[in-house]
From Swiss-Prot:
Keywords: Activator, Cytoplasm, DNA-binding, Transcription, Transcription regulation. GO terms for biological process: regulation of gene expression. It comes from Vibrio cholerae serotype O1 (strain ATCC 39315 / El Tor Inaba N16961). This is Cold shock-like protein CspA. The gene is cspA. Residues 7-67 form the CSD domain.
C-alpha cells in the first residue's frame, strides 16, 4: 500500500476534470484526475485546498489516488 501524503491543490480545472497537487515534502507536483477524488456528488477541488493522497504511477508519470479533503 502506498504511503499517505499531504499537500495543497495548485490548480484544478472543473471543466476538464484534472489538475495538480503541490506536495508538502517539496517533491514534484502530482497530477490529479477527478475520478481519484474521494467524495460524494460532484467531484472537484479548489485552489489552495489541503488534501491527503497516495501516489501511483500513471501512464504519463506520478498520479494522485485516494484524494481526500482535509
Amino acid at each position: 500500500m502506498s504511503q499517505k501524503m499531504t499537500g495543497s491543490v495548485k490548480w484544478f480545472n472543473e471543466t476538464k476534470g484534472f489538475g495538480f497537487i503541490s506536495q508538502d515534502n517539496g517533491g514534484q507536483d502530482v497530477f490529479v484526475h477527478f475520478k481519484s477524488i474521494v467524495s460524494e456528488g460532484f467531484k472537484t477541488l479548489a485552489e489552495g485546498q489541503r488534501v491527503s493522497f497516495t501516489v501511483e504511477q500513471g501512464k504519463k508519470g506520478p498520479q494522485a489516488a485516494q484524494v481526500t479533503a482535509l
